[in-house]
Amino acid sequence: MAVDMFIKVGTIEGESVDKTHAGKIDVLAWSWGMSQSGTTHQGGGGGAGKVNVQDISFTKYVDKSTTNLMSACCKGTHFDDAVLIVRKAGDKPLEYIKITMKEVIVTSLSTGGSGGEDRLTENVTLNFAEFKVEYQEQNPKGGSKG
């Protein structure tokens, strides 16, 4: 399934020309996770530890958001929120994943390239105080289920 992905980080503008997400940052790839330090392998009682929520990382083209993201990383700028949208592409696009982050800072930005690339890319990492994940189930035809 082909997808379109976009992120909005505070007031920073990207170069998306999508009619629904114009001005957001086009996302090429993203990664995020969390881990739990359970103790079930240490005998009876199997307690759960404290969750470790990782920073979210995304890959994007170098664009007009680049220098603003760099500046935000250098200054430790705090943004009220950031929102990542993943949408099924096609005639009837369906936004099926939405991750909203609150109290966001840019924790890293790395860029580079080689002569063989069409466009330069960069990786950006965000840290946040809280998050909300929303998921929209799809029906067999690719539309919204419920």
Locations of regions flagged by a protein language model:
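Glycine-rich, low-complexity intrinsically disordered segments
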Residues: 1-146
